[in-house]
Amino acid sequence: MTAQQIDASGRLRHLLTLEGLPRETLLQLLDRAGQIRDAAVGRVGNKRQVLAGSAVCTLFFEPSTRTRSSFQLAAQRLGADVLNFDASTSSTRKGETACDTLRNLEAMGVRGFVVRHPDDGAVAALADAAGEGTALINAGDGRSSHPTQGLLDMLTLRQAKGPDFSKLKVVIVGDVKHSRVARTDLHALRTLGVGEIRVCGPQSLLPDDETLKGCVVGDDFDAMLEGVDALMMLRLQRERMEEGLVPSLEQYHAQYGLTNERLARAGKDAAVLHPGPINRGVEVTDEVADGPQSWVLRQVANGVAVRMAVLETLLG
């Protein structure tokens, strides 16, 4: 897939996954996003119109609030016209394929597509169908990938702990098995050379494939917290209870919920991240989510800068 998203000259053509993305490319995107964030580019009265005259479509086949809004703001701040595609009211309900939808929008002059889809590999398939000069960005597909979330998580981690990841200990907590965010963050952390990756959750929610290769894996949250520099808490999807993978929300919180008492076991000033939406009282308590070690809202803010950097790189 990497060859598909990078052209023969080494230029990023699409952003489909962070798996296999060269470290240099990853760092360039993070550096540019950091510049945008630090300069507060994109605020009212300080717009960079590098995409003026370009059209970007958010093509979402799954619900989204943060990701869609963040991409829309990013594109608008770069001067692009933004078309929001709603699958529930589109011709896809009449049987039109996603590829035909893409081609019709291309014919209208849309150059960039931000796509979210419930199926693994769906965005890559659309990239295969796209014409020359069209760029696709994966805004989350199935369980496999969510590259801009991974980028904003890494940007937030750099902001919290500095650019050198080699001595950092990071723990990812929760439903790793069904999480595209966890898979994406694992690829990014490995590429950036993080010192130690720990993964913690109920055995029923941990993958049994190569996903966790090289990680320290365990189901004892209190033990896995010792000395960590950052915690990436994952959303517990309520359907996992219906599938019998989690006995109850109360029991999950008792074993894997982050409280101030538990956070005290982590390293000094450990950063708490969460991709959202947060189930308060399940993954984290109110005190942690709103506390001084929470970087959750800074993740959201960094998301706009990251998506501006990606759009600028692909379409600018």
From Swiss-Prot:
Sequence positions that bind L-aspartate: K94, R180, R235
Enzyme class: transferase
One Pfam short name: OTCace_N
Keyword Transferase: yes
Single GO biological process annotation from the record: amino acid metabolic process
Residues annotated to bind carbamoyl phosphate: R66, T67, R116, H146, Q149, G276, P277
Coiled-coil boundaries: none
One of the record's GO cellular component terms: cytosol
Catalytic activity: carbamoyl phosphate + L-aspartate = N-carbamoyl-L-aspartate + phosphate + H(+)
Record key words, sorted: Pyrimidine biosynthesis, Transferase
Pathway assignment: Pyrimidine metabolism; UMP biosynthesis via de novo pathway; (S)-dihydroorotate from bicarbonate: step 2/3
The organism's place on the tree of life at top rank: Bacteria
InterPro entries xrefs: Asp/Orn_carbamoyltranf_P-bd, Asp/Orn_carbamoylTrfase, Asp/Orn_carbamoylTrfase_sf, Asp_carbamoyltransf, Asp_carbamoyltransf_Asp/Orn-bd
Cross-referenced SUPFAM superfamilies: Aspartate/ornithine carbamoyltransferase
EC number from the UniProt entry: 2.1.3.2
UniProt keyword annotation of Transmembrane helix present: no
Subunit relationships: Heterododecamer (2C3:3R2) of six catalytic PyrB chains organized as two trimers (C3), and six regulatory PyrI chains organized as three dimers (R2).
Function: Catalyzes the condensation of carbamoyl phosphate and aspartate to form carbamoyl aspartate and inorganic phosphate, the committed step in the de novo pyrimidine nucleotide biosynthesis pathway.
Protein family (similarity comment): Belongs to the aspartate/ornithine carbamoyltransferase superfamily. ATCase family.
Name of the molecule in the record: Aspartate carbamoyltransferase catalytic subunit
Organism name: Stenotrophomonas maltophilia (strain K279a)
Gene of this entry: pyrB
